[in-house]
Regions:
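Conserved beta-strand-loop-alpha-helix hinge in the C-terminal portion
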Residues: 116-148
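Conserved H-loop
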Residues: 94-99
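Catalytic Walker B motif of ABC-type/P-loop ATPase nucleotide-binding domains
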Residues: 64-67
Length: 171
């Protein structure tokens, strides 16, 4: 798995010693120390997502782009990885552009949520998430969390009705 994390650095011509050190640091950051020599088939879905995050962070991007990274995972793994991403953000302070269709995930992770309209997609509203950091999944039960998710649903519902058809949501 460590070679997977190193791959982007190798393509850029980064020397092997530097690649290995940086990759090892990122593997530790995402909590996969001890799994460096495992093959993809030996890793869970959540571990594979953490490898992808480590690989992206190893390249030291200014902005980390994440498009539905937890979409194919079960709810428990999503919550765990959401907590891990919050921890990683606290350590790195990297700007992360995170695309999700999950309102709870958006409020948990974001500083700002950009709500997009259905076709044609435009920014319909930007909602500032004013929940203090550091955060963890315990905020899911807070009153402010419920207020923000409700506010987002109020903006999203008309868009969902357009995209899915009003009858689908009334059923």
């Amino acid at each position: 798995m460590i070679e997977n994390v190193e791959f982007g650095l190798e393509i850029e011509g980064i020397p092997k010693m530097v690649r290995r050190r940086r990759s090892q640091e990122m593997i530790e950051l995402v909590g996969l120390h001890g799994f460096e020599n495992r093959y993809p088939k030996e890793l869970s879905g959540g571990m594979k997502q953490r490898v992808a995050i480590a690989r992206a962070l190893a390249k030291e991007p200014e902005i980390l782009l994440m498009d539905e990274p937890f979409g194919a995972l079960d709810q428990q793994t999503r919550m765990f990885l959401g907590g891990e991403l919050l921890r990683i953000w606290e350590e790195t302070k990297k700007t992360i552009l995170f695309v999700t269709h999950d309102i709870n995930e958006a409020v948990l992770l974001a500083t700002h949520v950009w709500v997009m309209s259905s076709r044609p997609s435009i920014i319909k509203k930007i909602v500032d998430i004013d929940i203090e950091r550091p955060r963890d999944v315990k905020i899911l039960s807070s009153e402010r969390f419920r207020e923000l998710t409700g506010q987002l649903w109020d903006v999203l519902r008309p868009e969902a009705e357009k995209a899915l058809g009003a009858r689908a949501l009334k059923a």
